[in-house]
């Protein structure tokens, strides 16, 4: 027997090891990786918290269950107990093992589920904003109430578990006793049997359940700030004057009932227990009836008056939660009285107007600049740089390796040779080539650079498409970039990666389920494996509690490529705040900066006033750095994130209204303007553009994220909403309210104006023929002083799989003038230099008459040949024909 016991423990350990083998391997690798990225302390925060919590929770569970068990066997008058439990010590030993396993399991489940809430509770940071009903700081609802709710659910679940296990134990033991004594089971005696077996225990548990029902209704009282019963989110008139009153009564009555129940047990009386349970149920039902009566017979007919104070609470706290309470609001009285001097004063704004559009530019990048089939550009980023002494807005993108496109896609190619992307492409947003394509200032491999921006190490080991591991410093040279006659190779000189010792090779072979780690002769002791290379997944791995922006963007600094990811703190627990997309509070509290070569990942706090990020900083010591610790050149490229701006714009459409009466009527709702990408295409929500502009009353251009608002379900533009981001102005928001008594063209209405212009629509019809298609670019509405200048790039796309859209014309509109021009500068001249600010149609017609018909035919011939070459993907012939076309057009001038 002793030998069997001696074998049991090691056998049990072996079984556990096999069951958790993969998790153990993952755990070891995680330790190595977090140590490599210098965030091991962050990783151990969770583990340390779970272990520290498990010990006292295990003791509480174990003692509670053991005492309950002892109370069941203490009565030796019942034979069922004598036979089932107290005959010998075997039952006690068996229950001890059962209790140990159950207690440690429950302790682990509780600790791993609620460690974070407990740490949030202990590290709570005040918001210095109180809710208007209970006058508690908002921090109570975000950091403390969730823990109270969790404790309530766990304790109620445990008490119900005890009740259920008591009944199960009774039925098992009763059945065993009847079988052993050869007596029939009599269901009529169950009630008496239960009382004799565990009457007092069940009564105590019932008393505790009633006590925690009292606590549960106290939680319900606090949760009224999240009520959705009224006309606005948060506690309504009915909630405050009916539901709250009944909840308070239930809290008091159930508290008294729990005491009465426990006293009744001491006196051996069970009837008061039933009465207390009955009263509790009656009050809960009565609360629902009372709330229904108040809502339908008092509130419904006087709703606007009675709900106004609660609507105001909702407005004020929703605006605070989404950071809309600090918007600078100005009236924008459209005068359309611009003079030539105004244009000259805003030359930098006009020179930076974006005539390149995102989708066509990305298509062009992926057709012309990928160089080889295994490269790709994931997306286009927009930013501002001082290029050769001038402030410019630019498009830029990183050239990454698409490992899925490799051919052959072997293990060596995928993980040892094609380890990194190479280089970046940049073009100014305000200019195109004579063919209507982006005018590059950085392009090709190795980089051809016309700027003062240094890019000496353009390798991309960490990016948006780097979804697989690589092994560097192997016996095989890494592919660096292609050359005409051969490939340039490279040896990794960064410090990222985990050394590939034999033990580590074995660990990764198991983890990746790949024997190549052990069989490969190319891997040396000095080789390193780089994992978690996708920049967003890398940030999530380190700080999974943050929410990350959908659009990371690249920055060129210190000769290398860096990535910036906007990180958000969010919650759905902000009192009285209307939820949008499952959250009712958001702050862009941190920026994550990642080195594309070394993988260094730094989290910088950019909003010190946010209590949630400060709470995280207290919990995860060593994770965050101050914003000032980021290099100045990196900080200059921090952008106001579009994801945040999009949510704020959605909220602002309803919550720009501060008057509760107007809010109740719903008479002043806005929506983000619609737009149209094709001449006869469907409409969709306009994508907010980043614009270089000089705000009214400012003397310097800056980058602003701008959204256009319409009246709900109307196309008339009613407001401009902007977020600033340069220098000390970062994060400041401004709302320009447009006159409501005038027709102000929204992007969609502007498109309709274009379609209705006979001269322009005729041109579009000619272009939009069979074989080619006209496509709108990104609409820009540029405020200049008290006027609006509309800019719309026009693209022409030939039919065919490999066709590339070309920016052919720009439509400009100012006041009632609409011109179709070859460039913004030409369009501006046409609008502001023509006599009496009118377009001289006669001169245009006269100039047209002087053009030689033979040249026109020749131009048409070269154009058709170019389109045909484009369809066939023959870019050499395409370029030749376009050059010939350009020569003819120049001769016509």
UniProtKB/Swiss-Prot annotation:
Q: Specify where it is mainly localized.
A: membrane
Localization recorded for this chain is: Cell membrane
Quote the protein name from its UniProt record: UPF0182 protein CLM_0018
Q: Which cysteines are joined by disulfide bonds?
A: none
Ranges that cross the membrane: 9-29, 49-69, 94-114, 154-174, 202-222, 246-266, 273-293
Q: How does the protein's chain sit in the membrane according to the entry?
A: Multi-pass membrane protein
Which Pfam family, an example, fits this chain? UPF0182
Family listed? Belongs to the UPF0182 family.
Looking up NCBIfam families in the UniProt record yields: PRK00068.1
Single GO cellular component term: extracellular region
Q: Which PANTHER family match?
A: UPF0182 PROTEIN SLL1060 (PTHR39344:SF1)
Q: Which source organism? A: Clostridium botulinum (strain Kyoto / Type A2)
List the keywords (alphabetical).
Answer: Cell membrane, Membrane, Transmembrane, Transmembrane helix
């Amino acid at each position: 027997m002793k030998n069997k016991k001696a074998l049991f423990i090691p056998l049990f350990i072996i079984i556990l090891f096999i069951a958790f083998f993969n998790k153990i391997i993952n755990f070891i690798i995680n330790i190595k990786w977090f140590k490599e990225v210098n965030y091991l302390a962050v990783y151990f925060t969770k583990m340390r918290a779970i272990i520290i919590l498990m010990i006292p929770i295990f003791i509480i569970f174990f003692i509670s269950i053991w005492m309950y068990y002892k109370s069941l066997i203490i009565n030796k008058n019942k034979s069922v107990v004598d036979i089932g439990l107290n005959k010998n010590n075997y039952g006690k030993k068996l229950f001890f093992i059962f209790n140990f396993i159950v207690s440690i399991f429950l302790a682990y489940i509780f600790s791993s589920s609620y460690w974070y809430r407990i740490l949030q509770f202990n590290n709570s940071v005040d918001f210095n904003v109180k809710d208007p009903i209970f006058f508690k700081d908002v921090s109570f609802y975000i950091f403390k109430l969730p823990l109270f709710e969790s404790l309530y659910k766990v304790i109620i679940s445990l008490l119900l578990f005890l009740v259920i296990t008591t009944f199960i134990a009774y039925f098992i033991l009763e059945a065993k006793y009847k079988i052993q004594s050869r007596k029939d089971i009599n269901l009529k005696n169950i009630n008496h049997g239960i009382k004799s077996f565990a009457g007092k225990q069940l009564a105590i548990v019932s008393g505790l359940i009633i006590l925690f029902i009292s606590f549960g209704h106290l939680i319900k009282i606090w949760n009224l700030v999240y009520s959705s019963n009224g006309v606005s989110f948060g506690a309504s008139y009915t909630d405050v004057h009916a539901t709250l009153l009944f909840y308070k009564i239930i809290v008091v009555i159930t508290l008294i009932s729990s005491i009465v129940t426990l006293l009744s047990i001491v006196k051996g009386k069970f009837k008061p227990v039933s009465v207390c349970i009955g009263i509790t149920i009656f009050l809960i039902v009565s609360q629902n009836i009372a709330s229904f009566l108040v809502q339908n017979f008092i509130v419904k007919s006087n709703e606007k008056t009675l709900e106004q104070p609660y609507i105001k609470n909702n407005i004020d706290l929703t605006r605070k939660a989404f950071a809309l309470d600090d918007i600078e609001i100005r009236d924008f009285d459209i005068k359309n009285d611009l003079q030539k001097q105004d244009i000259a004063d805003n030359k930098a704004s006009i020179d930076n107007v974006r005539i390149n559009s995102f989708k066509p530019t990305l298509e062009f990048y992926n057709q012309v600049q990928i160089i080889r089939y295994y490269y790709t550009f994931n997306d286009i980023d927009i930013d501002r740089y001082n290029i050769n002494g001038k402030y410019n807005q630019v498009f830029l993108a990183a050239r990454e390796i698409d490992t899925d496109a490799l051919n052959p896609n072997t293990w060596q190619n995928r993980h040892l040779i094609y380890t990194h992307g190479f280089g970046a492409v940049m073009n100014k947003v305000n200019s195109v080539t004579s063919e209507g394509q982006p005018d590059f200032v950085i392009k090709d491999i190795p980089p051809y650079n016309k700027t003062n921006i240094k890019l000496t190490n353009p390798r991309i080991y960490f990016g948006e498409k780097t979804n697989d591991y690589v092994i560097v410093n192997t016996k095989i040279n890494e592919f660096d970039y292609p050359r005409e006659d051969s490939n340039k190779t490279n040896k990794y000189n960064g410090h990222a990666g985990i050394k590939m010792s034999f033990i580590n090779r074995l660990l990764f072979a198991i983890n990746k389920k790949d024997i190549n780690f052990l069989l490969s002769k190319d891997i040396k002791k000095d080789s390193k494996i780089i994992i978690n290379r996708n920049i967003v997944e890398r940030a999530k791995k380190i700080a999974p509690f943050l929410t990350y922006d959908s659009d990371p963007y690249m920055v060129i600094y210190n000769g290398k490529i860096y990535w910036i990811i906007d990180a958000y703190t969010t919650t759905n627990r902000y009192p009285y705040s209307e939820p949008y997309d499952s959250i009712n509070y958001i702050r862009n509290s941190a920026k994550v900066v990642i080195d594309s070569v070394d993988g260094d990942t730094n989290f910088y706090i950019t909003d010190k006033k946010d209590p949630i990020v400060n709470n995280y900083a207290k919990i995860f010591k060593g994770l965050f750095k101050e914003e000032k610790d980021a290099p100045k050149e990196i900080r200059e490229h921090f952008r106001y994130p579009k994801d945040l701006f999009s949510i704020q714009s959605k909220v602002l459409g309803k919550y720009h209204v501060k008057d509760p009466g107007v809010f109740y009527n719903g008479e002043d709702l806005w929506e983000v303007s619609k737009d149209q990408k094709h001449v006869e295409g469907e409409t969709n929500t306009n994508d907010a553009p980043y614009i270089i502009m000089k705000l009214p009353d400012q003397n310097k251009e800056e980058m602003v994220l701008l959204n256009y608002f319409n009246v709900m379900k109307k196309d008339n533009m009613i407001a401009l909403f902007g977020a600033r981001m340069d220098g000390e102005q970062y994060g400041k928001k401004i709302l320009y309210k447009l006159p409501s008594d005038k027709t102000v063209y929204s992007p969609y209405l502007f498109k309709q104006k274009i379609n209705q212009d006979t001269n322009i629509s005729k041109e579009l019809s000619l272009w939009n023929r069979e074989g080619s298609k006209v496509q709108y670019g990104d609409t820009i509405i540029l405020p200049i002083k008290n006027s609006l200048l509309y800019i719309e790039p026009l693209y022409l796309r030939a039919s065919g799989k490999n066709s590339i859209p070309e920016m052919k014309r720009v439509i400009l509109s100012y006041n009632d003038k609409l011109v179709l021009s070859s460039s913004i500068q030409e369009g501006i001249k046409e609008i502001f230099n023509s006599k009496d600010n009118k377009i001289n149609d006669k001169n245009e017609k006269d100039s047209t008459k002087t053009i030689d018909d033979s040249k026109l035919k020749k131009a048409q011939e070269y154009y058709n040949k170019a389109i045909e070459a484009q369809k066939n993907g023959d870019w050499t012939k395409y370029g030749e024909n376009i050059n010939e076309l350009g020569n003819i057009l120049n001769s016509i001038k």
